[in-house]
A protein has these predicted regions:
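Short, conserved DNA-binding cores of transcription-related domains
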Residues: 1-103, 109
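Mobile genetic element proteins and their domesticated derivatives, centered on retroelements
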Residues: 43-44, 58, 98, 138, ...
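Acidic/histidine-rich catalytic cores and adjacent linkers
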Residues: 52, 57, 61-64, 222-225, ...
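Short helix/loop capping segments that flank catalytic or ligand/cofactor-binding pockets
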Residues: 53, 106, 137, 185, ...
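Short, positively charged, Gly/Tyr-enriched micro-motifs
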Residues: 75-173, 179-184, 222-225
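RNase H-like nuclease fold core
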Residues: 150-238, 245, 450-453, 457, ...
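Inter-helix linker motif
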Residues: 245-264
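Conserved phosphate-handling catalytic cores of large alpha/beta enzymes
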Residues: 263-275
Length: 468
């Protein structure tokens, strides 16, 4: 268990210098001195020292070596001419037992992250490439296996390092938190809105009270005046707990977004007979923004799909009515009038199924009526840029190929520069302009899809998720 695997005579100064990792010494077993140049066996610099290891728990030096475990990493040697030399780095890590507090501990290292199969310098290169390409494509370029267990680790490390280099976040007066779904996973998006400027603040890994609480802990809570929320119970509870003095609102944008989702459910159900180009996007647009060609496509479709026609006509009437003064009873009344729209769209004697998809909107309005009324009482509503920003983010997420959260998070937070602001001589970051963010996200999607179509890039994830 505690037997030493190497003797000091096997230390290779040249290979240690080539490896250039301050913590490690390269040693060579007799059978790999000349034949296995791509394999570097290493030990900690203290391996041949007679000094006792210090227990990290009680600081005692009354410790003894218990075992040695070999850990294999992929690494890339530093090069002045840009040449890539990828090696197998095998680190023989020692474990110790403290005779005082009885804890077992290992040699502490910082050349690689816990749970990652790449050294930090290689993982940083892989993470940088994965910001704009698929992880598998980048790993293939470097000639290393695409470790599924490591991708999250390397992207989290890259994001953490980059954010740590930025100035602190300036807490915005107005927050917008909405909960989009990316391949069936809910990833809350946090925006700030200041006049007509909408900026991305962060993306959270899940919609839970604990996730929100962690994010809110980084804000100056007294500075937040208004928070626009989605009808999400976890979000609702977390916001009221963290910001008891702020105004909590549900905006017109949010209500219309959920109504569009209900219309989308109808479109999906009636979709076998719907021949409209980009049907979800086109059928959800206000009629005044439709081209003549789109109007003809919709007209032909509605003549065949009478249930969809009832939902579509009702939706268009609602958009017109909400351009004026509206309130919760008015929208609930619109939902109650849906059977009349079905009757107007049905042929004589035709019995169409009720539009139960919109019952969800009624539930939302009844549960969150105080937050909607708080919004309606505002003297100045949020700029139209908010609705455009949310729609642009949803569209870009819908088009982006599947990736795990850590990749998506890094792509959204690191590909566009954060805007900065100086307050009382101190520099702060204020977020990422959403228009630049979505433009970059769409560029990344185009790059990935183009390479797939050309057969240059094949991305197979561990799961086979899809939109729901």
């Amino acid at each position: 268990m505690g037997r030493r695997l190497f003797q000091e005579v096997y230390v290779s100064p040249d290979r240690t210098k080539a490896l250039d990792l301050s913590e490690l010494i390269v040693v060579s077993e007799r059978d790999d001195l000349e034949t296995k140049n791509a394999i570097y066996h290493t030990v900690h610099r203290s391996y041949f020292s007679k000094e006792k290891a210090v227990c990290p728990y009680c600081k005692s030096t009354n410790t003894s070596e218990t075992k040695i475990r070999s850990r294999k990493y992929k690494d890339i040697l530093p090069s002045k001419n840009g040449e890539r030399t990828v090696i197998d780095l095998i680190y023989h890590q020692r474990y110790f037992r403290c005779d005082e507090c009885k804890h077992v501990f290992n040699e502490d290292i910082d050349f690689a992250e816990e749970g990652c199969r790449y050294t930090n310098r290689l993982s940083d290169l892989l993470a940088e490439g994965t910001l704009t390409q698929t992880y598998e494509k980048v790993c293939k370029e470097y000639g290393v296996p695409a470790s599924k267990t490591s991708v999250g680790v390397i992207m989290r490390r890259r994001l953490r390092m980059k954010i740590d280099q930025l100035p602190p976040l300036k807490t915005p007066d107005n927050l917008v938190i909405f909960v989009p779904y990316f391949y069936s996973n809910a990833y809350p998006v946090v925006l700030s809105i200041n006049g007509g400027a909408v900026r991305l603040i962060d993306v959270l890994s899940e919609s839970s009270e604990s996730a929100y609480a962690v994010f809110f802990s980084g804000l100056e809570r007294t500075r937040v005046k208004r928070i626009y929320i989605d009808p999400d119970e976890q979000l609702h509870n977390a916001v009221y707990t963290a910001f008891p003095d702020a105004s909590i609102l549900m905006s017109e944008e949010c209500i219309l977004r959920y109504i569009r989702e209900c219309l989308g459910d109808v479109i999906k159900r009636e979709g076998t007979r719907c021949f409209v180009y980009k049907r979800y996007h086109t059928l959800c647009k206000a009629e005044k923004y439709l081209s003549r060609s789109e109007q003809k496509q919709i007209e032909r479709t509605l003549n065949r799909c009478h249930r969809l026609a009832g939902a579509y006509n009702a939706y268009q009437d609602l958009l017109v009515s909400m351009e004026g003064k509206w309130d919760v009873p008015k929208i609930i009344g619109w939902i109650e009038d849906l059977p009349e729209y079905l009757g107007d769209s049905a042929n004589e004697g035709e019995d169409l199924e009720e539009l139960i998809e919109f019952d969800f909107v009624r539930d939302i309005l009844e549960l969150y009526e105080p937050q909607v009324n708080e919004y309606l009482a505002l003297d100045q509503k949020p700029a139209a840029a908010l609705a455009s920003a949310v729609m642009a983010i949803l569209d870009s997420l819908h088009e982006m190929p599947f990736c795990i959260f850590d990749v998506l998070h890094a792509r959204m937070m690191l590909n566009v520069d954060h805007e900065l602001e100086i307050v009382d001589g101190k520099k702060y970051r204020t977020g990422i302009p959403v228009n630049l963010l979505t433009e970059k996200m769409n560029d990344i999607t185009d790059i990935i899809k183009t390479k797939k179509e050309k057969g240059e890039d094949v991305y197979e994830s561990e799961d086979k998720p899809g939109w729901s």
